[in-house]
């Protein structure tokens, strides 16, 4: 990873825990787990809380379908780590041949008309949110979906629009296919939190999204709140950030995180003076890009409701 503190653990206990989990599991603890263990109160806790609720909580979309949504979000963002991870999990919950075909080209795969319809919508939501309209929402509603089903699917893609940007900005190490296969059963069964998780009723995605936004963009941190908010807005296509190194990285996180270079992250670390500060700015940009899509989707849901 580009931030060694995140890779090794933010303190003695975290470093020890990472080594212990790696030893017990027989494989290197994936970077997706390391990132939510680091600076937990800032990012890990609100992010894993919403992710667990969206991916394993109550929904008319099956767990396998939600994992497929995550895999395709990763594909639409060219994130190799997340494509492999979520394809492996989805393949345990659904037919592997079907999952592989859907990841290759969901329009040609033998998916239900309902799943294909939501994927057409989600692709626009993920890749070109400014092109999303109420008509797109009405189209999927006419396929028999409820507004709640649309919101549930949007929550998955919002979360993984954040995760894929962090995976590529921080340059997650990519395990071999065997390690992805070994970790997939645990992920399918337990989900996105360590230990036990109680999920009661349908997730309140709007409240969970707001909790994430407030913590990352308004809560205490090493970096100034105004700068974190500026990074978030820039990643969502907003105005330039005053410092060139910050602006360059935030813009790239928003547009195509897989193109980020070591040098871009290094410049931000040099400017901030420490890895935790750089981590906060990278997270702020990724969260800004994801929540921009979420808010756009909610706006179109509201407009579609008023039109229907």
Language-model segments: residues:
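Hydrophobic alpha-helical segments
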Residues: 1-308
């Amino acid at each position: 990873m580009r931030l060694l503190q995140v890779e090794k653990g933010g303190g003695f206990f975290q470093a020890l825990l990472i080594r212990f989990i790696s030893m017990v599991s027989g494989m290197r603890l994936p970077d997706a787990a390391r990132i939510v263990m680091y600076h937990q109160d800032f990012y890990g806790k609100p992010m894993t809380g919403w992710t667990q609720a969206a991916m394993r909580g109550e929904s008319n979309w099956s767990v396998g379908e939600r994992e497929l949504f995550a895999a395709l979000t990763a594909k639409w963002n060219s994130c190799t780590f997340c494509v492999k991870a979520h394809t492996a999990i989805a393949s345990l919950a659904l037919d592997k041949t079907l999952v592989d075909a859907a990841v290759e080209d969901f329009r040609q795969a033998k998916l239900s008309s309902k799943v294909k319809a939501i994927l057409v919508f989600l692709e626009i939501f993920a890749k070109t949110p400014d092109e999303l309209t109420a008509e797109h929402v009405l189209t999927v509603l006419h396929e028999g979906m409820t507004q709640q089903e649309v919101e549930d699917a949007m929550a998955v893609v919002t979360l993984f629009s954040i995760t894929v940007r962090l995976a590529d900005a921080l340059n997650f190490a990519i395990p071999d296919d065997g390690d992805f296969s070994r970790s997939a059963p645990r992920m399918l069964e337990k989900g996105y939190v360590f230990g036990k998780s109680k999920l009661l009723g349908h997730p309140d995605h709007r409240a969970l999204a707001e909790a994430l936004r407030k913590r990352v963009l308004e809560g205490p941190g090493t970096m100034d709140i105004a700068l974190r908010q500026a990074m978030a807005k820039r990643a969502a296509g907003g105005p330039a950030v005053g410092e060139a190194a910050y602006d360059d990285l935030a813009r790239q996180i928003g547009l195509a995180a897989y193109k980020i270079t070591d040098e871009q992250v290094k410049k931000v670390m040099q400017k901030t003076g420490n890895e935790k500060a750089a981590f906060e700015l990278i997270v702020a940009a990724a969260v800004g890009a994801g929540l921009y899509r979420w808010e756009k989707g909610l706006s179109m849901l509201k407009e579609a409701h008023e039109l229907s």
